[in-house]
Every structure is written in C-alpha cells, then in structure tokens.
C-alpha cells in the first residue's frame, strides 16, 4: 500500500481544491504521508512508512522521508530503508492495549496519533474456490472465493487480500467491506471475492494473477478494521474515481494523525488467514458444500 497511498492522497488534494493552478503543483509535496498499520501477527513485519505527496500531474515516485525518529509506546522503529521504519523482529500488537505513535522529522516537526485494536469480529474456518469461466469482462479467467466461519454480533469492517503461492494482490486490487450481509451469523459458503487471471496483470504485478494450476495454494488474508480506518481506506478507493473533469468534488480525506500538513492513518489490526490447495482449477462448485462430488 505504501507505494500508492501518497499518489492516492495527492489525487484527493487536487480534487478537493476548487481552483487548481497547474503551475504550482509542487505545493502538493508539502504534505507528509503516514502509512502506519500494525498487526497482531508476530511473523508480519511491523512498519511505519513516511513519504511526501506527489503531484497528480507528473509520474514520479513519492519522495521518502529519511532521518525521522519514529516510536510506538516508546519503542523506537529503526529506518531499514529510505522512509521505511521497522520494529524489532517478532514485535506485534495485542488486544486491549492502547498504542501511541510519535514521529519527529529532521527539521523538528512533530506528529502523533493513537490507536487500539478492534475485536477480530469473525472466526475464519476455511475458504474454497469455484471456477467461474474465462474471457469474462476482459479477464483471461475468473474464480470465486467463498468463506466459512462465524461473524460476531458487533458491526465489523474488513480489508481482504488474496494471494497465490505467497504472492499477494497489490493494494488497488484488495477489497474493503462490512459485515451487513452476515452479521452475527454462521457463514457457510458465502462468496466473498473473486480471483482473476490476466496475463497483462501478471506481467505487471506478478504471479498473484497467474493461471491456477493443480497444487497452487490460494490464501485469503483478512484484517479487522476500526470504523475510522475503514472510512479512510474507502475514501482512497471511492473518491479518486471522481477525479475526471466535471465530476463532483469529494469530501476531505480523513486522518487521525495530529500535526501540520499531514495525511494518512495509524491503525492497529488483528489479522487472520485461511488457505485452500487447488485440486482441479476448472471445478465449477465449492467442494466444501458438495464433498460427495
């Protein structure tokens, strides 16, 4: 996500301005972008990413913010590469703990934010796949993914990512959703998302978009989100579709980072996974629903 967040937020800055001076697009580089998402998974690298917004009008990499002091609850994150601040190996967050992020830039500006982990919200027992056809909507092939489990009675919000053999979809192909269709219910074979194979996408993003073969492992990774972070992510995906000329102006993008000229979010999320091994990539039904087939 850190590659796309500065660009997406730059689009929102442009879209939220009634009059845009094309000669002063460098002004958008004045905003710090904070991408800080920590999880309860000790095997997941816990990072805080700092960059600057980039102009909507130029194809350029977001400038990385180097030399900052970044800490969470007084634990210092070390800069592992330009703009990427990494927690010690094995560090992870825990339910019921409040987390305080502090950022001090080399020029002396300070930023801070607070977050706590929401309840998991869903017990994920398993997933399954079904072939849905090929040459559909310009895609080479399409599969649907269904989930099994139990949703809690509380309102919950999720960020869902798919992976094939450990290669995961990029941020713009992930999914955000609430639980309005299965709140407080046992879930058996609910079609949650789709997996696509496209040679064009495979060449651009890697083997997450490969054609499924026997023995491939499909993994669904889900994160439970607090409502503010869900709204923030939704703003990145929905408001940027309104950029073309004559479209309505979106609302200002939300942030929970305190400080001047700053965008982004600090979130703490429980993370859970389920996987299925492909037996027959052309199987047109969920075997977990029809095990006798």
Across the structure, where does each feature detected by a protein language model lie?
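Sec-dependent bacterial lipoprotein signal peptides
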Residues: 1-14
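A sequence/structural signal for flexible, mid-protein segments enriched
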Residues: 17-293
């Amino acid at each position: 996500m850190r590659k796309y967040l500065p660009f997406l937020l730059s689009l929102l800055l442009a879209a939220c301005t009634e009059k845009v001076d094309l000669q002063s697009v460098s002004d958008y580089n004045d905003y710090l972008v904070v991408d800080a998402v920590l999880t309860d998974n000790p095997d997941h690298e816990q990072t805080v990413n700092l960059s600057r917004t980039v102009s909507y009008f130029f194809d350029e990499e977001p400038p990385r913010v180097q030399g900052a002091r970044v800490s969470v609850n007084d634990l210092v994150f070390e800069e592992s590469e330009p703009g990427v601040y990494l927690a010690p190996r094995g560090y992870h967050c825990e339910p019921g703990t409040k987390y305080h992020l502090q950022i001090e830039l080399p020029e002396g500006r300070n930023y801070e934010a607070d977050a706590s982990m929401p309840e998991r919200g869903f017990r994920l027992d398993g997933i399954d796949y079904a072939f849905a056809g090929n040459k559909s909507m310009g895609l080479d092939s399409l599969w649907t993914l269904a989930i099994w489990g139990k949703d809690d009675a509380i309102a919950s919000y999720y960020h869902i990512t798919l992976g094939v053999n450990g290669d995961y979809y990029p941020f713009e192909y992930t999914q955000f959703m609430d639980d309005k269709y299965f709140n407080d219910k046992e879930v058996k074979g609910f079609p949650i998302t789709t997996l696509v194979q496209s040679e064009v996408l495979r060449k651009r993003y890697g083997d997450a978009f490969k054609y499924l073969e026997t023995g491939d492992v499909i993994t669904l990774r889900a994160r439970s989100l607090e409502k503010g972070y869900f709204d923030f992510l939704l703003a990145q995906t929905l408001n940027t579709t309104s950029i073309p000329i004559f479209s309505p102006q979106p609302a200002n993008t939300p942030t929970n980072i305190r400080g001047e000229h700053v965008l982004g979010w600090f979130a703490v999320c429980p993370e859970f996974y389920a996987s299925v091994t492909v037996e027959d990539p052309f199987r047109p039904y969920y075997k977990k629903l029809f095990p006798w087939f």
